[in-house]
């Protein structure tokens, strides 16, 4: 399975000043690491996703200010959030067999606020790397159609996130309530 991941960082200077040791790769997570994580996660989830020879997705690491703008415009909630996911698998468009076999299947974009991730990591007493991976798994599951309409489905999703993190060697203390 091939996986293409486009990582972008869009953090303004005032936000950079709020974050400690922030560079283009927060928590030292380089593009190849993101790609390896998503490849591992998609392989693990493959029985539950549309078959394709390759997949592609985007990850935008941004500020509270930018994610609040997106949250207000797309979810009508004028406040920052930790992660947003914009799925392309929900979009219906004609696909020929040749197209499916020759082009990567775009599953969507994940937007993560590094500022919120840093606060949540401190609150949960784990590394920023762990929090960013946690949020990435949450966004990925949303891209693949998972949702949490109530506490029960949220807990199922959280347990799946723990399993995904374990697949890439990240452990997290998870307290379901």
Region locations from a protein language model:
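Conserved ATP-binding N-box helix of the HATPase_c
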Residues: 141
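An acidic/histidine-cluster motif and surrounding catalytic segment
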Residues: 1-133, 144-177
